[in-house]
Structure formats: structure tokens, C-alpha cells
Amino acid sequence: MSLDKSKHEKYVQILREELVPALGCTEPIAIAYTAANLRKIMGGIPDEILIESSGNIIKNAKSVIVPNTGGMKGMEASALIGLIGGNADKGLEVLADVTEEHVKLAHEYLAKSCTKLKLMDTPASLHIRITGKLNGDTGVAELIHQHTNIVLLKKNDEIIFEKPFSLESAAGALTDRTCLNVKDILDFADTVPVDEVSPIIMRQVEYNMRVSEDGLKTSYGIETGKNILKYNQKKGDDFSVKVQAEGEVAAASDARMCGCSYPVITNSGSGNQGLAVSVPVVVYARENKISEEKLIRCLIVSNLLAIHQKTGIGRLSAYCGAVTAGAACAAAITYMKGGSYEQVCGTIVNTLGTVSGILCDGAKQSCAAKIASALDSALFSHELAMDGNFFAGGDGIVKDDIEKTIAGIGVVAAQGMHKTDEVVLQVMLKD
């Protein structure tokens, strides 16, 4: 059954808002983007820089390589390369034009120790404020809730740009996600004219599979993706599409976490989650000779189910997004194979009832292994669901209704794991 026009338009707009290109891990890129905006109002590179951010930004920017920098890591590097070589007009591809000269200059500024870091006292999990001083002038650029949501640009006492925001809530910055539910997502995927969403979805296929291919042919980190295939995959009659999917998506994350210069298409503000909801679906479609139209409809399911789950959790938390992305991806594969609404719900429930609670301890090499592990459990959950085996309401956090289960996970992640998030950051920052 088709959705009403208003909800249909919202679903298309949500896909447009969430499936966007990003070059590099989105938290250090958000720092670089904020810094690039600061340079625009300062007219040059500040001599002194104060980088203030929420704990989750510190967590996710600490260990991941910033793209196009030759291996630079950390918040200072992210801010400096954004100030020196960033192009704020390119959004999450802010570092696309960085050159070797920019990187050399960033190292020189790092050597001057001109940057300071400060943990912000803020209820927002995604919050960045960068203050710079140059020739007696002071500039401020501030971003909150979404990775390109600049809310303040100020030079001395002059407000150059400002928009209202709430520290506690991201409501209003994007299309209201509360319209999402599993049944309507499936109805939308069944009925939306493919031409209406094809440019959005097929760009995700093109970008994310290119990164996966790069991860398989290039040495990145500990080569999780390559090694999954090396240790587990066999040719001929023993070929496993499940292992292939896990290897290809892990390889994509290997590349992304270790400085790959190709952009990916995100989901819920995360490149890794964008990879996790798309690459395995493409692999299953390829191996099962699924048509492009059906692939597009399956990727609609995967993307929107992931966004739906993340709505209650929030963009950044101590709850690893590989779990929700894996559940969404496996549910889309259930849909691909003709599974019913009950079987799609069962896939999600089985996954959330099994691997919920995997910690997010920041963006780094092991994200690839977490994605593969979550996907492995999710694909087993898919197999169980296809045979009619589902966890029942009352089994731990599982409720008797899919929407209640998803809402409960949101409460666990956003409220229950708040203290966990603080302790994880403390452990990460302690020698």
C-alpha cells in the first residue's frame, strides 16, 4: 500500500539528507569543516587556536587517520588541515582539495604548539567550537548536532552568521524522523517510483563499492577485510556469500579508517554505517543476480531501517552503530529474499536481542572488525527469521512489538549508556 503524499515526501527527503558524501571519518571532518568556516571569516590562518568539543567528538577523532594528510591523526591535525587546506563549500568533502603543501604547513603549525584542546561542558553529543586569534582579531565558529550544522560565525563583536539551536535537542535541523516505522518503510520501498530515488541510492552503490574495492587491493591497517576472506572464503561449491559480504564491507572500513582518499556515502552521519548498510546488500544482490531496481528497493529498506533505529539512539553514543546498521542490512536481505513483514521484524529483533551493547570506543581500525562481527550475527539472525524463528517479547530487552523493541534500544543507548560513554572516554585518554 502506498504511503500518503506527505509521508512519502518525508521519506525521500530523509534519504536525501542522510545519504551524503563524506571524505574521511565524519567527526574529524566535522572539526575540519568548522575550522574551514573559521578561516573564511578570519581571512587567514589564526596564530592561536582553541578547539572545544563534546566527549564523543574527542573519542571519534583521536585515533582515526585524516584523509589526504599522509597519516596525520587527532583533533589538532583535523583542525589545522581544515584551516589551511579545507574548502568549507564542499561540506563533508571539505578536505578534497588538500595538497602536500597544505600538509607540510599543518606540520609546521603543529610544531609551534599553537593549538589547545578543551572538553566542553555540553549535553550535546556532537558539539564543536573553534576559537582563533589573528592580528588582534578573535573569531569563533560553532557547530552542533549534525556534522555540517554551523550555528555561529563571529568575528570580534560582529555576528556574521547565527541560527537558533537547542543544546538538548537536534529537532528542527532535519526532517522529523518520528514518521519512520518498519511497516511504512517496507510499503515505501515497495511502491516508490524507482526513478525518484535512483540517483540517491546508486551514488551510494558507486561510492561505497569503490572504497570496498580499494580496501581489498590496498594495504590498510591490519587488513581485516582481506583476512576474513583469506581465512574463511573458498571458491567453487564452498563459496559463501555471507563471508564475502563480511570481507568486502570490512575492507571498506579498513580503507576508511586508515585514510583512504575516496569519499563514501553516509548513513546517520556515519561513513562506516553507510558502508555497513550498503556493501553487504550489494554483494548479496550481485551473487543472487538481483535486478538493479530490486537492489535499489532493498537499499531503501536498509538505509531507512538504520536511520529509524538511530533516531532514538542519537548520532553519537556509547552504542556501536555497527549493530543497528547490521540489523538493517540483514533485514534488507530478508526483504530481498521475499521475506514477510514478520520475518523482516524478526531479523531486526534477533540481531538486537543478540549483539546490542557493543561499545563504541571511537573511530579506528577495529571498527572494521566490529562491522564484520555485527554483520555475522545479523546474517545469522536473518537465517533464523527466514525459518520462522524469532526471539519473543520478554526475552530480555525484546518487546512483543518491533517498534517498542527499537524504542527500548534507544533508551538503553541514549540514557543507560551515557555514563558508559564518559568512562570509555576516560579510559581512552588515560596513559
UniProtKB/Swiss-Prot annotation:
**InterPro entries xrefs:** Ser_deHydtase-like_asu (IPR005130), UPF0597 (IPR021144)
Q: Name one GO biological process term.
A: L-cysteine catabolic process to pyruvate
Q: Which domain of life is it from?
A: Bacteria
Question: Pfam families, alphabetically?
Answer: SDH_alpha
Q: Which GO terms describe its molecular function?
A: L-cysteine desulfhydrase activity
Please state which protein family the record places this protein in: Belongs to the UPF0597 family.
Q: Which PANTHER family match?
A: UPF0597 PROTEIN YHAM (PTHR30501:SF2)
Name of the protein? UPF0597 protein TDE_2144
